[in-house]
Amino acid sequence: GVHRAANIMVAEAAKVIENSQRDINIAFMNELSIIFNKMGIDTKSVLEAAGTKWNFLKFYPGLVGGHCIGVDPYYLTYRADMLGYHSQVILAGRRINDGMGKYIGENTVKSLIKAEKPVKNARVAILGFTFKENCHDTRNSKVFDIVNELREYGIEPTIADPQADADEAERLYGVRFTDMSEIRDMDAVIVAVAHDEFAALGIADID
């Protein structure tokens, strides 16, 4: 159905907080994943167990890009600053989410070192480049943050995304995609976007 807001300001504020709330919830999951990684605990298993409680909100760690969720919170915090209030929770969530690409890149390098694989020129594949799963849109994709972080260590990752707009990705980011059939004999594979076809992959499919 259609909900009639009291006025345009209420409608715009509602849209902003819809996306801000999601941004903050994902940021919380991302922070938990960082903590659990240091503790040696599997985040997915923790969330599955916590999800058995009827009122647990099911959000998952991941990259937050696109032109809505990662942008809308700043409209609210900017206006708050103009009114003399400095946002804390909203901006904290933004900092966490904006840093996840770098975090993933760094942890990939650490994993290579632990596996005694040479870091420079390591064969690393990134699966997915769109800003969210099961879409073609690459605008404001945070996967590019992973690419840039790996490049800092002398790694030029191989990127595959059968759903992404390849022309758009090359125009916006200067990256070219590889066919999934070429993802073989890699030192590391990062599943950056949860496309349905990636969820069905097993180790044998990329080994």
Regions found by a protein language model. Name each.
Residues 1-207:
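Structural/interface elements that position substrates and couple domains in central-metabolism enzymes
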